[in-house]
From Swiss-Prot:
GO terms for molecular function: acetylglutamate kinase activity; ATP binding. Belongs to the acetylglutamate kinase family. ArgB subfamily. One of its GO terms (biological process) is arginine biosynthetic process via ornithine. It is an enzyme of class 2 (transferase). It comes from the Bacteria. Its EC number is 2.7.2.8. It comes from Rhodococcus jostii (strain RHA1). PANTHER family: N-ACETYLGLUTAMATE SYNTHASE (PTHR23342), N-ACETYLGLUTAMATE SYNTHASE, MITOCHONDRIAL (PTHR23342:SF0). This is Acetylglutamate kinase. Pfam families: AA_kinase.
Length: 308
């Protein structure tokens, strides 16, 4: 089954024609543009969602859009730690990474999660190539701390991306490939750090001049007053988001920080979407209403832009 057939499976031929016709303005708008997609959450553990996501990436490449995938691997890392009798701990939304945990993170991200995703995409053609933040000096990291109950807290070998050397990724894009990036990176002394995938995706999107950053999550989008489900925001600008960040649930903070960084760094829009919905990336890019929450540089008017 081709990527296009996979993406349009389950609907009639008439509906397929309507969907493709409706998508035309967005196909034109995003042709030859780079879209960075952070792959994570339930989308990377459910087999049907994994297959749908891979088809979406191949679809984008087929219609002339240039996807770059940046992936985490939280569920798989947790599973491997459990098999090895090791415990996992989170503080401030980030994994506490000891040297022993770092060995597992490195093995799982590049050797398991990345390889599986490359294989799923390449079922549609020889498109995807795996790369890690260590390769060709793609990322350089510095150790970070997080605020827990108002205090800076050490979380081990966890880093922030401080420099990006995007040439290896740009070379792959120019060759018609889909880069699949594992988020591990050395510091200036060569010590490898675990990089939050949301953080890495934002830094890469900024460095390569992406048109969009799309972050997959396990919720419908950003709730400004969780758990009030009526507080789901379809759009928020960077100033409003910056004010809201301190009050967000710890798990959402890295995702929204990533969107904030990307848009402030020149990416036109960033999006948090529900990765539990099959083909959610296509719904965001190619439908008028989009899906999830869009982060913008400033308030937008209803007539601004063609797509969300």
């Amino acid at each position: 089954m081709t990527a296009i057939s996979e993406a349009l499976s389950g609907i009639t031929d008439h509906q397929k024609a309507h969907v493709l016709a409706e998508a035309l303005p967005w196909l034109q708008q995003f042709r030859d543009k780079v879209v960075v997609v952070k792959y994570g959450g339930n989308a990377m553990v459910d087999d049907a969602l994994k297959t749908a996501f891979a088809a979406d990436m191949a679809f984008l490449r087929t219609v002339g859009i240039q996807p770059v995938v940046v992936h985490g691997g939280g569920p798989q890392i947790n599973a491997m730690l459990g098999k090895l009798g090791m415990t996992g701990e989170f503080k401030g939304g980030f994994r506490v990474t000891t040297p022993e945990v770092m060995d597992v993170v490195r093995m799982v991200l590049f050797g398991q999660v990345g390889r599986e995703l490359v294989g799923l995409i390449n079922a549609h053609g020889p498109y995807a190539v795996g790369i890690s933040g260590e390769d060709a000096h793609l990322f350089t990291a510095t150790k970070r701390t997080v605020m827990v109950e108002g205090k800076p807290t050490d979380i081990g070998l966890v880093g922030d991306v401080t420099t990006v050397n995007p040439e290896a990724v740009l070379d792959l894009i120019r060759a018609g490939r889909i880069p699949v990036v594992s988020t591990i990176a050395p510091d200036s002394d060569g010590v490898v750090h675990n990089i939050n995938a949301d953080t890495a995706a934002a830094a890469l999107a900024e460095a390569i001049g992406a048109e969009k950053l799309v972050v997959l999550t396990d919720v419908e989008g950003l709730y400004t007053n969780w758990p009030d489900r009526d507080s789901l925001a379809t759009e928020i600008d960077v100033d409003a988001l910056a004010q809201l960040l301190p009050s967000l649930d710890a798990g959402m903070v890295p995702k929204m920080e990533a969107c904030l960084r990307a848009v402030r760094g020149g990416v036109p829009t960033a999006h948090v979407i529900d990765g539990r919905v099959a083909h959610s990336v296509l719904l965001e890019l190619f439908t008028g209403e989009g899906i999830g929450t869009m982060v913008t540089p400033g308030p937008t008017s209803p007539t601004e832009g063609v797509a969300s």
